[in-house]
Amino acid sequence: VGEVVVSASPFRPTTESPVSMRRIGTEEIDLTPGANRDISKVVQSAPGVLSVPTANRNDVLVRGGGANENRYYLDGIEIPVLNHFAVQGGSGGNASLVNPELLKSVNFYTGAFPAQFSNGLSSVMDMQMRSGNPDRFHGKLILGASDVGLNVDTPISSNGKTTLTGSFRRSYLQMLFKVLKLPFLPTYNDYQFKVNSKLSDRDELYVIGLGSFDKNRLNLSMKDPEEDRKYILGYLPENNQISYVFGAGYLHSFTGGRLQVTASRDYLKNQLCKYENNDEALPKTLDIDSREGNYRVRAAVSLWDLNGFRLQAGVGGGTGSYRNETFRQVYTAEGSQEDRSSSRFTVGRYEFFATLSRDFFRERLSVLAGLRADGMTYSDLTSNPFRQLSPRVSLSYKLSRKWRLSASVARYHQEPSYTTMGYNGNLIPGYNQKEGLRYMAVNQYIA
């Protein structure tokens, strides 16, 4: 037998997303030059994707959209914060929280998003974690370019039907930066885990977690720092950031279909502080405490054989909360004055989605039509889900074994960020944020 070479294209069209969907394997994550095994950097090489030309940033711009227009999912659960030292209200950051060694597959959509994914205008990343080893314990110690970590893969029941896979990582950048006499000393920690239990041949229950604790301190031990370092020490605040997502999912398979139910809690706490002359004995010039969190629940059913049609439909809902306390010492020509602001609110949200698809002409032509509706109780402009209808149509025709003609037309909506909804305009007399704030929308045409 001669040599056999098996290869697969990363671009695999599906009925839901016949265009602009790329599957990323763990091997590609490991081998992408300069990515340092960071999934956020790997996708920057995809067609239509640009990165922010700033060192050590993971902000991704897709098809001309903003860095806050990307959405991330892990085993069907939304991940609002994907990166360390994340920008609140955006999706960028310093390095990805996700450990690629725990992933089974990644689907990256730059268009033609499936209807079950909400709030994405530019891209959606759908990640699936692998289950743990059902036979024996396996541990791995990893020394990376910027961190050290421990991976664990083990059964946690005697019959091997319940497993655990997880990791913990901690950076050593603060030691390296101190040796290099840089003015800031960042430290990040993250954890990730999945507990998976096979209840029966048709039923599966899983629990996932993803979180981080990041802090940035000023390097005040430098003697006679250079002018550029003095400048950075003069304006840069110290900060702490905590984020986490905990979620659970239930999968039930039946003849011709599947049911998935998920519930999750996510949270982000962002604190910044600055003292006059970096001396804690002197008054503060900046003190920000900003927090946001969500409870989410979603149920979706997929039916694969309805007289030749395929149907996917689901509903979801939840609550979200935001709190911000800000103090700034503002210096003007007339002197200094204190600027204080406080904002907090709670919203409810709800969603519905459905898609119907079918193949024609002996599976040469695939057609899909879908609809999604979202709403939240923030204001009259956002509460009616019929204002945020997101229809979509896609088709794909197989011309030959190697050629396929595909197209997609869709409209997508995204709710404003909490930082935008929470801005109270205390410096603008008569300002009312709720009067004009609404969902963002985009019409997308891809062929």
Task: Please state what every model-predicted region is.
Residues 3, 7-113, 124-126, 130:
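Periplasmic N-terminal accessory/gating domains of Gram-negative outer-membrane beta-barrel systems
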Residues 6, 139-143, 164-168, 207-209, ...:
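Membrane-embedded beta-strand positions of outer-membrane beta-barrel proteins
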Residues 58, 121-123, 137, 143-150, ...:
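Hydrophobic, lipid-facing positions within transmembrane beta-strands of outer-membrane proteins
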Residues 83, 89, 221-226, 269, ...:
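Surface-exposed extracellular loop regions of Gram-negative outer-membrane beta-barrel proteins
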Residues 105-116, 122-130, 137-183, 190-198, ...:
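Predominantly transmembrane beta-strands of Gram-negative outer membrane beta-barrel pores used
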Residues 112, 129-131, 143-147, 156, ...:
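Transmembrane beta-strands of outer-membrane beta-barrel pores
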Residues 176-182, 212, 218-226, 263, ...:
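Outer-membrane beta-barrel translocator domains and adjoining extracellular loop/strand segments
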Residues 196-214, 236-382, 398:
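Face-selective signature of the C-terminal outer-membrane beta-barrel domain
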